[in-house]
């Protein structure tokens, strides 16, 4: 998809429309959930749903501001999705959060007897489907959840939705980079990091 297929303007965007499109942030799936309909820009001829990057841009700002209210050490970043693992860890390391990358051990938030038992104040996940276990546990212990949500995701268990392609390598790198940059800005820091610093090697 090129720029003229999404002729929109962003209000004080974090990056340009072209950069969002180049990263594939807008590319959804061929399924649309009722929860995500307000974040969808259009459906392509091949049946692929396209996310509205105006919503993505605003929700990244919202999520970063929300997360910046917390002590970074009390933010838990969880992802089992392959292309989410490197950027999620880089995000966690950059802001001082705690990452759980790969397999999530059930009971981490609910069973104090586990060696890796955690008591975060907020949880960030890459995909509400593959990271469902931690979301369920967060609800049990009343911890808010920030989630990267694609067109097919249900969001009823999520407190802050960031609409994005949550499967693509470049898209996840861009989203976690922008969350990092905005989070640090709210904390009073600048960063020299770039989206490429968050990109998983092929």
Swiss-Prot record:
Keywords: Ribonucleoprotein, Ribosomal protein. One of its GO terms (cellular component) is small ribosomal subunit. This is Small ribosomal subunit protein uS2. Pfam families: Ribosomal_S2. One of its GO terms (molecular function) is structural constituent of ribosome. Belongs to the universal ribosomal protein uS2 family. CDD domains: RPS2. HAMAP family: Ribosomal_uS2_A (MF_00291_A). GO terms for biological process: translation.
